[in-house]
Amino acid sequence: MAVIADPETAQGFRLAGLEGYGASSAEEAQSLLETLVERGGYALVAVDEALLPDPERAVERLMRGRDLPVLLPIAGLKEAFQGHDVEGYMRELVRKTIGFDIKL
């Protein structure tokens, strides 16, 4: 599985053991997506929906004649936690996982 998201979110996925690729623009995300699809080796590629404004068109164009990878638009952390304490959530998640509170 590979994930294309903003650089901070991609880093989080890498820390979780997945292949995370950071993109700062829709053009950069599109280029990364094309590279990953052409290279092959992934059953699933998740893409931050903020970086893929027209997922249906991307799937149609990139996946013509291919079964894999499955392209999955996902909400980015910024959108998912809009108005919430992201730092507190991540700190609590780390504390539960490793048993220590880490102040970022």
Swiss-Prot record:
Tree of life domain: Bacteria
Species: Thermus thermophilus (strain ATCC 27634 / DSM 579 / HB8)
GO terms assigned for molecular function: ATP binding; proton-transporting ATP synthase activity, rotational mechanism; proton-transporting ATPase activity, rotational mechanism
InterPro entries in UniProt: ATPase_V1-cplx_f_g_su, ATPase_V1-cplx_fsu_bac/arc, ATPase_V1_fsu_sf
Identification of the protein by name: V-type ATP synthase subunit F
Protein role: Produces ATP from ADP in the presence of a proton gradient across the membrane.
Gene: atpF
Sequence similarity: Belongs to the V-ATPase F subunit family.
Keywords: ATP synthesis, Hydrogen ion transport, Ion transport, Transport
GO biological process, one term: proton motive force-driven plasma membrane ATP synthesis
